Regions:
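Bacterial N-terminal signal peptides that target proteins for export
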Residues: 1-9
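Short beta-strand element of the conserved SAM-dependent methyltransferase core
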Residues: 57, 143, 214-216
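Bacterial N-terminal signal peptides
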Residues: 8-18
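N-terminal amphipathic, basic helical "cap/leader" segment at the start of enzyme domains
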Residues: 24-137
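A glycine-rich helix N-cap at a beta->alpha junction
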Residues: 203-220
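Small-aliphatic-rich amphipathic alpha-helix that forms the alpha element of a beta-alpha
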Residues: 50, 71, 98, 139-152, ...
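A solvent-exposed interaction/effector surface
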Residues: 22, 198-201
């Protein structure tokens, strides 16, 4: 009995030491490891290698926790005081949320805390697009604009909120493209999505709208 208790304690300690496991707070939150922001491929070389890859991906193996952390930080992480991000945002709305669909579940990225909120443990990758390869890739990002945050002094501006939200999304998507080029990962941004199906699966509010999706995978 004593050995069993000790063994359980050791297993618990090992899980606590694995990034995103012990810090998962009962499975609701996954704390990402700090992003590695030093080094990397020179910008001009990454621009030269940037490309869109449609299917033909390699093995459906998940990205490592560290690569996922680096990717999300590059996409729209906090890079200076005041909560400002790696991607510009019109009027500093910061109104684009990044949802992740992977084989093991659905998640929402919190850039301020640099962690993932677990929204579900089912494989819902198919909702991320209409192309067959979205279910083959280890990661699909879904960019959702929150129009409730697209305001000036609390006043909504419907005449510009959608256009500016598309621009904000594009900034983030390009950051992901450059990161993937640097890490030699396959990537493609996609507009062929079903916003209604996404809204239902992600349980979005009426003020939220799916803008684009982006697939990340390993090359074959």
């Amino acid at each position: 009995m004593k050995r069993t208790v000790i063994a359980c304690a050791v297993v618990g300690l090992m899980l606590w030491m694995v990034p995103g496991t012990a810090s998962a707070q009962g499975g609701d939150v996954i704390k990402l490891p700090p992003a590695q922001t030093g080094g990397g491929m020179p910008l001009m070389q990454a621009l030269k290698l940037r490309q869109s890859t449609r299917g033909g991906f390699g093995p459906d193996k998940p990205l490592s926790m560290q690569v996922l952390s680096n990717l999300l930080w590059a996409a729209d992480g906090v890079n200076r005081e005041g909560g400002h991000r790696t991607a510009p945002s019109a009027a500093d709305w910061q109104n684009i949320d990044i949802y992740l669909t992977m084989a093991d579940g659905l998640y929402l990225y919190d850039p301020i805390k640099h962690e993932l909120k677990v929204l579900g443990r089912e494989d819902v990758r198919a909702v991320a697009g209409q192309q067959p390869f979205v279910t083959e890739a280890p990661l699909n990002l879904i960019y959702v604009a929150d129009m409730a945050r697209a305001s000036f002094g609390g006043k909504r501006m419907p005449e510009v909120e959608e256009t500016w939200s598309y621009a904000n999304t594009a900034f983030i998507a390009q950051n992901v493209y450059l990161f993937c080029a640097s890490e030699k990962l396959a990537c493609i941004v996609r507009a062929m999505i079903d916003p209604a199906a996404i809204a239902k699966t992600l349980k979005l509010r009426p003020e939220q709208k799916a803008i684009l999706a982006q697939t990340v995978a390993h090359f074959k």
